[in-house]
Amino acid sequence: MTDPPYPVPRGWLDRYGWAIVRERVTSLVEESRSRIAFLCGSAENEADVRDLFDLIVCLVIDEDTLRHRLATRTTNAFGRHPEELAAALKWNPLMRAIYEGHGATLIDASKPLTDVVDDVVSVADAVREPRGDA
C-alpha cells in the first residue's frame, strides 16, 4: 500500500493499513550512517523495524490543533474527508499511548512548527553525541 484513494471510501481505513518494508528501512540506515535521518509516520508492522532506530520520537498534539492543521495544510489532503478526520482523531490518543509504552521521547507538537523542529533536532543531536567509545 502506498497512498489511499482520495477521498477514502466508507470503511476503507478499517480494512487497509500501512506496512513498512524492513529492507527499505535497512537501506536507509546504511545510507545515513554518517548523519541524522528521520523516518516519519507509523505503520501496522512497525515493530518489525523498531530495533533499527536509535531514538523514537512521538509528536503529541491536542485534538483542536490536530483538527486545525488537517483542515488547513496544503501538502496533503488526508484528514479533510470526514472518514479520514474521524480516523485521525481516533488514532491520535492511541499513538501517544503506544509510543509512550515503547519509551518514545514525547514532544509537544501543538507548539509553533519552528519550536517543534528545534525540539526534535535537539533530542536527535543528544543521541548523536559521542559516548566515549570512539
Spans of features found by a protein language model:
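Short, well-ordered alpha-helical microsegments
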Residues: 44-47, 116
